[in-house]
Amino acid sequence: MDSRLLHDLKRLLGADGVLHEPADLLLYEYDGSVEVARPDCVVFPRNTSDVVEIVRLANRHRVPLVGRGAGTGLSGGALAREGGIITSFARMNRILEVDVENQRARVQPGVVNADLSLAVAHAGLHFAPDPSSQKACTIGGNVSENSGGPHTLAYGVTTNHVLALEAVLPTGELVHLGSSAVDSPGYDLLGVFVGSEGTFGLVTEITVRLTRLPETVETLLAIYDSIDDATETVAEITARGITPAACEMMDGWTIRAVEEYVHAGFPLDAAAILLIEVDGLREVAEAEAEIVADVCQLHHARSVRVARDAAERDLLWKGRKNAFGAVGRISPSYYTQDGVIPRTKLPATLRRVGEIGRKYNLAIGNVFHAGDGNLHPIILFDERNQQQFRDAVRAADEIIEYCVEVGGSITGEHGVGMEKDRLMPLLFSEADLDLMKRVRSVFNPEALLNPGKIFPTSKGCGEIYVRPQSPVAAPPA
């Protein structure tokens, strides 16, 4: 990196606000995906003014710039694919304002998702998007990826809960999108910005909608001896006119991994479980819970139980939300995918996932948002074995290709990033992709902000078939 740029960044942020030594950069080569990319430096702004100056400096020196929250993303979105500066929002983590009466809050992008809900729980409110990483992921990252979570089924994704944004464009221009009003005139630039994966600008403030906590929550655990029976239950519940707050599925392999780690009370001999939640007014929630239990039993659930209290409910959800961590304890590496399919295609798709695993001799666990058909196959491999790594990537691609074949999508909530850019042509024509690039160029004309993301590049998929080793982490010769 140019020494003059480094000097200017240190003068702006102080020596403790800039990292550039190889050992210090190691953490920032990674996120939650299998991708690796090294930045030239990492900076830590304290406020919007710092971000404006960082962007202006990067623009002046023609250096790529990438925003980063907690680094929990699963598509390489927060990695510096082409080097340059990573802007970490770890120090911009304040809840600036809470308006209980109007059910909204204004926050900096580094606020942790779960921390906001904890801060407003006393008022009977919460922030509805709930990714499994909600105890670590940031609201700024949620905005960039348009994150969802188990309760997306009833409450929607992040864009449904964002009222307004303050953002810095790649030119250093500060813009305000949306408003606290129910609707605002003009083009829906806010809607375009949310989910743009950091390619339009760096978000510095977010006004979010807060949602009332439901009067009653009924959480059911249904246990099955057949995966097909579990998947058919999901379609039947929605066919009965019930939209659960959440409807999660876990297969037998994942159940055993989770139970050894969390001890949530999942039966080790089950082929699958469904974790279903209905909420709302007491009479409605209790009635819907009875219908859901009946449907589960109609489809041969071995047993159905309702959580007796909040403690039991929290334990069940702890099991679900720690699934990825549980897998990490028993495998050197794992690759989490994120495809979407119609609910009616769940049985066939899970069978196909099993076939792909056997083809490559790889174990694949399944834990996912069954209610909206958002799959998260977890492919186990050892990254020290390059052939296993290549096979894991090929297996992941084949799973996503099948999702598209049956009428689904290449991603539901993890984003495209640098992981799936090569798969975009499965869904979009050249004309479609060109139109998207033209929209990006309105905000980011020089493509200096988060370059190499979303759109296919000349590097193609070969870039991740041989995972580079960090010179810091590499063993001595």
Place the predicted regions along the sequence by residue.
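Activity-critical C-terminal alpha-helical subdomain
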Residues: 173, 421-477
